[in-house]
């Protein structure tokens, strides 16, 4: 029931209000969509939860730079991510004189036996070698975390949760150095 054109402004206010609640014992906030006065919030979190914002729109990048700790894009094509996504985020950070937020993408994992040779290939789709290269590129771009999304929207695939778990085990065995929190050489 939220008007489409108001979603961004509402999200901005909710994020700002959360930060007030997390950083004050007695919190007040007065906005267009959220308002509260003298709310006792204790005990406050010992560590303020990090806020990750997704999306590729200009508004999402502004929201990330101004209100979040990390940018969380999903379903990324590495070529576009390198030449468009990350540079745009840097430009927005410079425009607002803010530090560059962490970059923590979610990649849809789909391990194949053979390489996928397509300009439209998503990061995380392809052979183990391609996925290793994707992760190395993300590391070079300064990504702090990478989430592997194994959720398969294709319900015609039997045992799709089992397949996702198998992909994660394979990555852990052959691509990732879990103890070192890095990628195997």
Pin down the residues of each PLM region.
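Active-site-adjacent structural elements that line small-molecule/cofactor binding pockets in enzymes
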Residues: 1-185
């Amino acid at each position: 029931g939220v008007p489409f054109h108001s979603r961004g402004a509402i999200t901005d206010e909710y994020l700002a209000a959360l930060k007030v609640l997390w950083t004050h014992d007695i919190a007040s906030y007065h906005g267009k969509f959220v308002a509260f006065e003298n709310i006792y919030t204790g005990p406050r979190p010992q560590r303020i939860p990090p806020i990750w914002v997704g999306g590729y729109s200009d508004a999402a990048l502004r929201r990330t730079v101004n209100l979040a700790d990390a940018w969380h894009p999903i379903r990324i094509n590495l070529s576009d991510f390198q030449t468009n996504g990350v540079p745009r985020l840097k430009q927005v950070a410079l425009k607002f004189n803010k530090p560059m937020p962490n970059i923590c993408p979610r990649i849809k994992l789909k391990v194949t036996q053979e390489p996928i040779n397509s300009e439209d290939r998503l990061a995380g789709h392809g052979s183990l070698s391609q996925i290793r290269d994707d992760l190395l590129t993300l590391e070079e771009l300064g990504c702090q975390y990478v989430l592997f999304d194994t959720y398969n929207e294709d319900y015609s695939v039997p045992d799709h949760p089992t397949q996702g778990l198998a992909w994660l085990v394979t990555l852990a065995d052959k691509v990732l150095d879990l103890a070192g929190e890095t990628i195997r050489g």
